[in-house]
Each structure stands twice: as structure tokens, then as C-alpha cells.
Amino acid sequence: MLKILQPTQQGESVAAKNANTEPSFRLASTDSDLPAIVRLAQKAHKESRFGYIPFNADKVLKIARAAFKDQKRHAVMIAERCGQAVGFVYRSVGEYHIGSDVLLTTIHNMNGSRTIRSSLSGGKIALGLFRGVKTWSKARGAKEILFHVTSDVNLAQTHKLAKRIGYKFVGGSYVKTA
């Protein structure tokens, strides 16, 4: 595809400038991805309703490394903007726990950094992560994608986006102190 470059007053091209600011998405697959995954998970954890629970970076590392080893069933996708990791999604595919012969994808964790969520790029990041999940799920033959939201962060905004991109509301999560 031919791109027409429009010079700016400084002589740089708009396409080159946008290439640095547009989000990119990739599957995480090596230990070099781990610091960004842990950093994003820790920030999201602190902000969420689960922030009172001590964060365990070793558990994040264990989950990510297990996903790296079994990429047919698990994956971590990282969203980057300007060379910095600004979001990620961890998902897996498998059978319904009391069913057989049908694969379902479960989004276990989807996070975007707080600063990116409040910008125009936040929507692009979220949509890119959802598209990545859909593509990955189709490649594995999943029939449905389950998206569970339990963070208690931006619930109305998350609900609106999920509905807009085709997710059907099928229930809710409830919590009570034991």
C-alpha cells in the first residue's frame, strides 16, 4: 500500500511522526518482556479493588513464563506506544469446566496504564488488545470469548466499550466480606 507523506513545517513527515505515536501490539514471548508485564500488573493491581491484597511479582512471572511455554493455550499480548509498554492482556483457551468439545477463550487480565486510559490512545490500545484476543482465539478454534471484569475500575466505561464491540452482558460479579 502506497502511503502519501505530507511534510510538516519542520520538514518531517506526518507518517513518520505518527509511526512513533501509534500503538503497536505483540505477543510477549521472552524474559525481556517480564519487567514491563510485572510493572503494568502491579500498577493495575494497586488501582483495583484487590489493591489491599499484597502484590506477588513471582506469581506474575510464573503465569507469564507458563504462557510463553504453552502458546497454543495461553498468551500475553503487550501494547506499546512510543516504545513503552502501556497495556497488556493475558488470556487462555480451553474447554468449559463441565463441558467438552468446545473451546472458550477467557480474558483473565486486561490492563491499560492509567495515563493512557485517559487519552485518545486509550481507546486504540483497548481496541487493539481486544482485536488481538479475537484473532488469537479464532486461530485456536474458540467459539466464544469470556471477558470478566472484577477490578472495580471504570466499570461504566468498560461496559460501554464491551457492548459497543459486540460483547453481550451475561451476568455480574458480586463480593461480600467473609
Language model: regions and residue ranges:
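Acyl-donor binding region in acyl/amide transferases
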Residues: 102-163
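A short beta-loop-alpha structural element at the N-terminal edge
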Residues: 22-39
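Conserved beta-strand in the GNAT
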Residues: 78, 84-93
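Flexible, glycine- and charge-enriched loops at secondary-structure boundaries
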Residues: 30, 53-57, 119-123
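Terminal substrate-recognition subdomain of acyl/acetyltransferases
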Residues: 1-23, 138-178
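A short helix-loop-beta-strand connector motif used in the catalytic cores of GNAT acetyltransferases and
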Residues: 65-78
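A conserved beta-turn-beta hairpin within the catalytic core of GNAT-like acetyltransferases
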Residues: 95-107, 168-170
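Conserved GNAT-fold acetyl-CoA-binding loop/helix
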Residues: 45-64
